[in-house]
Amino acid sequence: MLDTHINEFQYTEISPPLIVNEEVMFGTGQLPKFEEDQFEIKFDNSEQRKFLIPTAEVVLTNLVRKSVIDKNQLQKRFVASTPCFRKEAGSYGKDTKGMIRQHQFYKVELVSIVEPSKCLEELERMSICAEKILKKLRKLKLTV
């Protein structure tokens, strides 16, 4: 799946850290809104709060957070496959009763940085990329 995103769809693979600081979590809106759903990591003698990533999106979007990107350097497309960590202590997922919820799961994340005028076009492109992956997965033979 990653090979397809990289070679066919021209995404740049990023291997993000699984532990991020509080500033990074605020930068993507995970804090304070979803604080109760986060796994905070305690380090000896450290005053800085650290968290396990709830999604690779947190790291991928922070790659450009404090940047002014020249229009000629757009678009930027990132892909990452990571474990994600969430407590899901709040009401998120309340409408999925009966489903088994996990605190750790794996996910492939796509992030595109484009000009505002090209956002809808890029969203459509991302949807097509995801659809192509799903079609490839449907061709896999089930073996037991």
PLM segments and residue spans:
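TRNA-recognition modules of translation machinery and tRNA-sensing kinases, especially anticodon-binding
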Residues: 1-144
